[in-house]
């Protein structure tokens, strides 16, 4: 595991340094639906009386989960995390409608995302600048692991604060990491990010194309370094519930499948990670996923009505899984 993370989890035993098992938080991608894990984390912070960065040794995030990972670990001037989970939930309420607002020009030129991305990134960049400032990965209050994908090199790209602290060619601005992991194809244009040393530039898109649930990425990061895991808390952004009926689908071609195939692949990737993490973690995997009974499963429905519905689905998850959340709080706060 990252040396910083292992040191943070260390304790003294008989004069020797003993590394305690690592506590991991993984946050799914899901666009505006990131409001759900933000509210779950706000509840965890309320119950424990501690910031998320103080409860977990590693926070992994994809897309909107990567934005949360950066926001939760940005240091403030007092040496504590600058943002609470509740403050980040407010980001979705206030900035979400601006981020997912299509200009008339975009409506005309994108043709529903067929020939250009759906949204300009001005509002997204402004929000990330406001919430993340000039903080860099090396500054993170606890280890972060954020997914992206290099479209030129054709490889999975990982923003890792553990490497950023020891090698400036792996250090990036938090705002750039958050923007890269949020560069969902057809929604926002890709971004080029340059490391702190100015040695290399990477053209990146959303890590959700392969790791919508980054729990297994986090698992590999920890176990691959020889450390043990005490708990993996994996927060979803709401499960898709819309069925695709056989009689409707069997005659579909490329055009009809364009959006549904993204949903199906996303679900399949998340479910596969869920299975792998449950099997390999030997009872240490805690999945908190809301059923979207009323809210839209669209990544970009930031309407006032849907934001209220997302809050309602989050509140129901918290109520229905209250005992599980309490047990998790005891695990991570102990």
What are these regions, as identified by a protein language model?
Residues 2-334:
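Conserved catalytic cores and adjacent C-terminal regulatory segments
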């Amino acid at each position: 595991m990252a040396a910083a993370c292992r040191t943070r989890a260390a304790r003294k035993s008989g004069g020797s340094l003993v590394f305690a098992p690592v506590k991991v938080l993984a946050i799914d991608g899901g666009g505006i639906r990131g409001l759900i894990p933000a509210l779950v984390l706000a509840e965890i912070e309320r119950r424990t009386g501690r910031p998320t960065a103080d409860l977990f040794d590693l926070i992994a995030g994809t897309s909107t989960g990567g934005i949360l990972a950066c926001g939760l670990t940005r240091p403030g001037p007092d040496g504590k995390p600058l943002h609470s989970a509740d403050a980040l939930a407010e980001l979705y309420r206030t900035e979400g409608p601006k981020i997912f607002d299509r200009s008339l020009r975009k409506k005309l030129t994108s043709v529903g995302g067929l020939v250009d991305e759906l949204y300009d990134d001005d509002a997204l960049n402004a929000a990330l600048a406001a919430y993340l400032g000039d903080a860099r990965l090396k500054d993170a209050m606890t280890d972060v692991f954020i997914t992206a994908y290099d479209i030129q090199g054709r490889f999975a790209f990982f923003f890792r604060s553990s490497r950023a602290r020891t090698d400036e060619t792996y250090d990036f601005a938090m705002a750039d990491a958050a923007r890269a992991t949020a560069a969902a194809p057809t929604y926002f244009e890709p971004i080029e990010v340059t490391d702190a040393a100015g040695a290399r530039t990477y053209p990146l898109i959303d890590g959700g194309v392969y790791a919508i649930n980054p729990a297994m990425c986090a698992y590999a990061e920890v176990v691959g370094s020889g450390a043990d895991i005490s708990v993996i808390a994996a927060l979803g952004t709401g499960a898709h519930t819309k069925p695709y009926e056989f009689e409707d689908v069997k005659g579909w071609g490329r055009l009809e499948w364009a959006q549904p195939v993204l949903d199906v692949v996303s679900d399949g990737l998340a479910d596969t990670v869920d299975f792998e993490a449950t099997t390999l973690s030997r009872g240490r995997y805690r999945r908190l996923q809301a059923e979207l009974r009323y809210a839209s499963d669209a990544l970009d429905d930031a309407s006032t009505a849907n934001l209220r519905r997302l809050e309602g689905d989050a509140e129901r998850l918290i109520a229905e899984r209250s005992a599980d959340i309490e047990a998790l709080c005891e695990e991570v706060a102990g």
